[in-house]
Design a protein with these regions (language model features):
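Residues embedded in well-ordered regular secondary structure
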Residues: 1-89, 127-130, 174-175, 179, ...
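Solvent-exposed loop/turn elements at secondary-structure boundaries
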Residues: 277-301, 364-422, 438-475, 513-545
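A surface-exposed, glycine/aromatic-enriched loop/edge motif typical of exported proteins
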Residues: 1-30, 119-160, 282, 374-399, ...
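Transmembrane beta-barrel strand/turn architecture of Gram-negative outer membrane proteins
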Residues: 70-152, 177-216, 237-277, 282, ...
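Membrane-interface anchoring segments and C-terminal beta-barrel signals
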Residues: 369-371, 602, 613-718
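Outer-membrane beta-barrel transmembrane domain signature of Gram-negative proteins
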Residues: 35-67, 71, 223, 232-329, ...
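Surface-exposed, extracytoplasmic segments of Gram-negative outer-membrane nutrient-acquisition systems
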Residues: 32-39, 404-410, 449-472, 506-557, ...
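Outer-membrane beta-barrel signature, preferentially recognizing the C-terminal barrel domain
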Residues: 170-176, 300-317, 400-440, 468-491, ...
Length: 718
């Protein structure tokens, strides 16, 4: 894995970092010098980055598949165990899966398929990222702590307090819990009934549906004897969350296929029903009794959040396909949807679609040509995104006045006219193949415009409300996708398959409808995201201020383009070697990990002097004027060797002889992920987003470092 490295401390650096002439500054400087000299004499420096992150951990992934059946009944059963130990102590991930599929031919006219799976995952996340004023972040703590202060556990089992930050990260890691346990069950069925079959037509009825049950239990525990907890009024913090989701879907459709002379027609009409049920409870206890983890054993007990969500959606769809001898293929369709989330839950919204494709090589003028495929295509479609739950209504909040419980209106007012966000997309493309498709090109250009984008609209204070949801914003999305694949070289004992992909996407705020604002991050001092009509989505702005309310543009989180290069080599029919490169050009991150390192004096080049003016780099970051928001906005371009694999498949006759016909296939190999990363980005990984916000992403705040992974692979078929 990539480590950032830390700047070494010296007496000269301490005298500068803790400079000052007041008595308190002098006392602090002398104290730090004493600590440094003692550590130096005992050679007891601690590289905290190495201590927490630089570890080799074992992971395993085991799968077992069993399949079989008869001409009427076929089955597939699979199970898997995935066990990953995290880089950081007491972190990791385990997943257990069971899956069963059954295909039953009830009669010649009735077929039934049933699929079911169960997934149980257990995640110990640890404490990285933003610390939310709890001290619970390894990244924050080690950025502030010099390497000459030893925070490790003492022989008597205690942990020293951290004088440089609000928490000792080693005690935090050893004693605290941040766990998520998920149980999920997914089942589905598909029933097909052939109503009639003729020589040139048939009609069938299709009924399919499914259910998805998810239970997610989260637990965060910060013991009362942690440093930060001892500094607050109610030490000892326990936070328990429980989410239960039960979703079902049911779809019924009639399909009629017939020939209209030389044109095959396929007609569909159907309806769909979706039901969503979500219950969430998040409780918190503060001021825990010693050694307790029960909310009821806390001095302050709070229902931090609770909601019950019930959503219903229904739709009707019609579709007509026409296929002229596989030469010209066209589709027309429309879907009518309604949702209980919309302002008018009974209103049906229409979403049409159409597509046309032509296989020109199926016509006589291109038959037996070196161009083996030439397929221009065009498609248009409309769709919608859901309205946020509760946007229609003005919710009530609980109040306590003189010991009497009551309810009052929230400051956010509902919008009974709220509409779903809609998208209209036009796609133009062509698929080209030459030399019997030994070389293929796929090219697509698309324009996607979204309307009725939901944004908060601030209201006049005299209204008594602060904001409401609005449908005023519009986005314009334009992009291109290219794929070039082929077999550059093929002989009896060697085959090379290759695929090169390129994609580029630009999103512009074509209409905002509300006043310009910034969102995400920690404000204009460090870099935040601009929401302004005519600007690209993801524009990063910050100090210095140009005009009142207008700040310097430092970059954009959208990449200029992405590329991938995938190759597979088959050697002597038994060896397979493959690798995948990913390249992202452009796209900026707000790197606040460096902010924390600079503030703690620990960034790798902190005491260097790049421009020779006598001021350390950590106190004077480019670009000029120094120490503006631009110093945290970095180009996050990268080239990554994403995957590499080398596998050997034993010849069938050798396998059967070696395993006495008990094993039909034996395959072994080695593989790796994230083996090479080429980037100028100074953080752990340019692929980071601490908050996962779609509008304001690409913020780097003490993340969990990404790891290089190596696997030994064994596969046996019995």
């Amino acid at each position: 894995m990539k480590l950032l490295g830390y700047d070494d401390w010296s007496e000269e650096k301490i005298n500068y970092f803790y400079g000052g002439t007041t008595q308190s500054q002098t006392n602090r400087r002398n104290l730090e010098l004493e600590r440094f000299r003692e550590t130096k004499a005992n050679n007891n420096f601690v590289d905290y980055e190495d201590f927490f992150y630089n570890h080799q951990r074992f992971s395993s992934n085991t799968r077992l598949n069993v399949s079989g059946g008869t001409d009427k009944t076929k089955f597939f059963v699979a199970g898997g165990i995935n066990d990953e130990n995290g880089l950081i102590k007491n972190t990791g991930f385990q997943r257990y899966t069971v899956r069963a599929n059954i295909d039953q031919k009830i009669t010649n006219a009735i077929q039934l398929s049933v699929n079911s799976s169960y997934i149980r995952s257990n995640t110990d996340r640890g404490f990285t990222g933003n610390q939310n004023r709890t001290g619970a972040s390894i990244g924050y703590a080690i950025a502030a702590t010099p390497n000459y202060y030893d925070l490790r556990q003492r022989p008597d089992g205690t942990y020293p307090d951290n004088p440089y930050f609000t928490e000792n990260p080693i005690a935090l890691t050893d004693k605290s819990t941040n766990n998520s346990l998920v149980n999920r069950s997914i089942s589905s069925f598909n029933l097909g009934i052939d109503l009639f079959k003729g020589e040139s037509s048939y009609m069938k009825f299709v009924l399919n549906g499914g259910l998805d049950y998810l239970q997610n239990t989260t637990n965060i525990h910060l013991p009362e004897d942690l440093q930060y907890q001892r500094s607050i009024a109610n030490p000892g913090d326990i936070m328990n969350g429980k989410q239960e989701s039960f979703n079902t879907n049911l779809q019924a459709a009639s399909v009629y296929n017939f020939n209209l002379k030389r044109v095959n027609m396929n007609s569909q009409v159907g309806m769909v029903r979706l039901d969503f049920k979500d219950d969430l409870l998040f409780v918190r206890g503060q001021g825990l009794a010693p050694l307790q983890k029960n909310v009821k054993q806390a001095a302050v007990q709070t229902i931090f959040n609770q909601f019950f969500m019930r959503t219903q959606e229904a739709g009707i769809f019609l579709q007509q396909e026409a296929n002229f001898e596989d030469k010209i293929i066209g589709t027309l369709g429309v879907r009518f949807d309604k949702s209980s989330l919309n302002g008018d839950p009974s209103k049906l919204f229409a979403f049409p679609k159409a597509s046309l494709a032509m296989n020109l090589t199926s016509f006589d003028f291109l038959k037996d040509h070196f161009i083996s495929q030439l397929k221009p295509r065009i498609a248009y479609g409309e769709t919608a995104g859901p309205v946020a739950f509760g946007a229609t209504y003005s919710s009530l909040v609980g109040v306590n006045i003189g010991g009497l419980l009551g309810s009052s209106l929230s400051t956010t007012v509902g919008n009974v006219n709220i509409l779903p966000e809609t998208a209209k997309e036009l796609e133009l493309g062509v698929d080209v193949g030459i030399l019997k498709n030994r070389l293929s090109l796929e090219a697509t250009y698309y324009i996607k415009n979204t309307a009725n984008n939901i944004q908060p609209l601030n209201l006049s204070p005299s209204s008594g409300f602060t904001s409401t949801s609005s449908n005023l914003a519009e986005l314009s999305n334009k992009g291109i996708e290219l794929s070039l694949s082929g077999t550059p070289f093929e002989r009896e004992n060697f085959k090379w398959n290759s695929r090169l992909m390129f994609w580029k996407n630009d999103i512009t705020i074509s209409k905002l409808g509300i006043p310009t604002y910034t969102t995400g991050g920690f404000g204009v001092s460090y870099g935040t995201f601009l929401m302004k009509e005519g600007e690209k989505l993801g524009t990063i702005v910050g100090n210095p201020q140009i005009n009142p309310g207008e700040y310097t543009v430092w970059g954009n989180s959208q990449p200029k383009f992405n590329m991938s290069f995938n190759n597979n080599f088959t050697i002597y029919k038994n060896f397979d070697f493959s690798f995948l490169f990913d390249w992202k050009k452009g796209g900026y991150n707000v790197n606040l990990t460096n902010l924390n390192l600079d503030e703690g004096g620990n960034s790798k080049d902190w005491f260097g002097d790049r421009n020779g003016d006598g001021i350390p780099n950590g106190k004077q970051r480019e670009p000029e004027p120094f120490n503006n928001a631009g110093r945290f906005v970095e180009d996050a371009s990268y080239i990554k060797l994403r995957e590499v694999g080398l596998y050997y498949s034993m010849p069938t006759e050798v396998t059967q002889r070696l395993f006495k016909n008990k094993v039909q296939r034996f395959r072994a190999g080695i593989s790796g992920n994230n083996l090479v990363m080429i980037t100028k980005y100074s953080g752990y990984d340019p692929e980071t987003s601490t908050f996962g916000n779609g509008l304001a992403n690409n913020i780097d705040v003490g993340p969990y470092p990404s790891a290089r992974r190596f696997f030994l692979n064994l596969s046996l078929d019995f």
